[in-house]
Amino acid sequence: MARGKNVELSEYERKRQENIAKTQALLRNLEMEAAEAGLGPTGKSRAAASSKPRVKKPAPKKIKQEDIAPRRTSSRLKGIEADSEKAKRKAEDEYVAIKEADRAKRQRVSDAFNFSDIVVAGKDWNRSGNFLSIGPANPYERTFDFDDVKETTDKELRALREKMSGLQLWEDFEPNEIKITPERIYAMGMHPTTEKPLVFAGDKLGNLGICDASQKVAEVKQEDDEDADNEGPTITTLKPHTRTIHTFQFSPHDSNALYSASYDSSVRKLDLAKGVAVEVYGPSDPNEDQPLSGLEISKDDANTLYFSTLDGRFGIYDMRTPSDQAELFQLSEKKIGGFSLHPQQPHLVATASLDRTLKIWDLRKISGKGDSRLPALVGEHESRLSVSHAAWNSAGQVATASYDDTIKIHDFSKSAEWATGTALTDADMKPSVVVPHNNQTGRWVTILRAQWQQFPQDGVQRFCIGNMNRFVDIYTAKGQQLAQLGGDGITAVPAVAKFHPTLDWVAAGTASGKLCLWM
């Protein structure tokens, strides 16, 4: 047949070629759609990895965690028929066993611990591990900056603002490198020593993280080595409690003694010199659930422990006696979020409660019988929403933070003159200063609390409080803002903030267990 001659196609051949054309068109459309969606093969292979070997960090020492939960077993292998009475009993027994295991995991342990027994992460505790040896928020939007400092006309106030605003984050490590606790931080504090910054933090699961902030970067980072791993500081993590550590305090009588209060219903004393943690208070019935929301040791008596509970009770306990000898007073029908003793007049107690009140109590006069036995109520002030904490300073002022988005400062500077049985009027209880402040922490951020510096060296009373825009605010007792501390590497709200007792060092913790430290 001549090559150029037209040939009439059969009906079958024509149909076959139409089907081929349709199939090819469909394939082309699919390829185009895949390319637009980014599913097709890339034109270039990934760049070859750098020939420079990457230094691997040594694997951290793993501590075996014992699982106390019962193991599931196969009913079929045991010959138990499905839906039989025997199978139902087996399922019920397994459910009870799992619930009991969960309860046992959360129940407090009353035994004394050596620190080496409760280290869960970081450096092992030994002689060298005693750190006391000398060796809606708008993230990052400032509400106080250096322009406010420059515009200050009062010379003394301006000097103080310049000083406090000049505090800098720990230069050796960024906050996102300093994971001081495994879980959300609830309590923060700095050891009273002035030799070096020694930071403690308590978290949601009962861990206590300890960071010696005098340590330096172990390895100098090479500028051209972008792949180098950033190692954080050495952290030691103890687990003295089985549930949230809500509050802790260094004893005013012994700086080696740290007292911690927990939702596991216990108070423990950690002896930092001996490396031992012992329970000093807990309900006499080990099954009683009495979560604690605060504790304090008076400067006048090293043996008396004051504490508050989430069910509105306030306790006084002589630690030399059995725990059932503790005096308990029902000061509120709702949760007491925090309390404090007047530093100079420790018979005066300020409580903040979910019932929206700040109340001042006088422990010198206790009257009534049974459940009605109470200290004398000096006065109370009601806010629009719940009050999270009440903190005395040594000048007789009380700072509170509440969900009505305010910080209130109440002036009771004449409290040293109050006779037993003094009753204040509503006008006397009104705050002298009200500072607008966003306190809407929500579910995932620890409640903001105003915390005074115990012994300011210049005599100017000041407190710090976390800021929802990822800063820490510092105010005077007159409500004047001194600084808004921030910096690079702060990726969450530093909600739990605390001053060093005497030095201008501020430590703050986040919901991810990270530490921010300004010095």
Curated annotation (Swiss-Prot):
GO term, biological process aspect, one: regulation of DNA damage checkpoint
The keyword DNA damage appears for this protein: yes
Pfam families: WD40
Family matches, as SMART domains: WD40 (SM00320)
Keyword vocabulary terms for this entry: DNA damage, DNA-binding, Repeat, WD repeat
Segments of skewed composition (Basic residues): 53-62
Record GO terms (molecular function): DNA binding
Region (Disordered) location: 35-92
PROSITE patterns: WD_REPEATS_1, WD_REPEATS_2, WD_REPEATS_REGION
Annotated Gene Ontology cellular component terms: chromatin; cytoplasm; nuclear periphery; nucleus
Transmembrane segments: none
Domain of life the protein comes from: Eukaryota
WD repeats: 240-280, 287-327, 331-371, 380-420, 442-485, 488-519
Composition bias, Basic and acidic residues: 78-92
Protein function: DNA-binding protein that binds to both single- and double-stranded DNA. Binds preferentially to UV-damaged DNA. May be involved in DNA-metabolic processes.
Similarity comment: Belongs to the WD repeat DDB2/WDR76 family.
Protein name per its UniProtKB record: DNA damage-binding protein CMR1
Organism in which the protein naturally occurs: Phaeosphaeria nodorum (strain SN15 / ATCC MYA-4574 / FGSC 10173)
Classification lineage: Eukaryota, Fungi, Dikarya, Ascomycota, Pezizomycotina
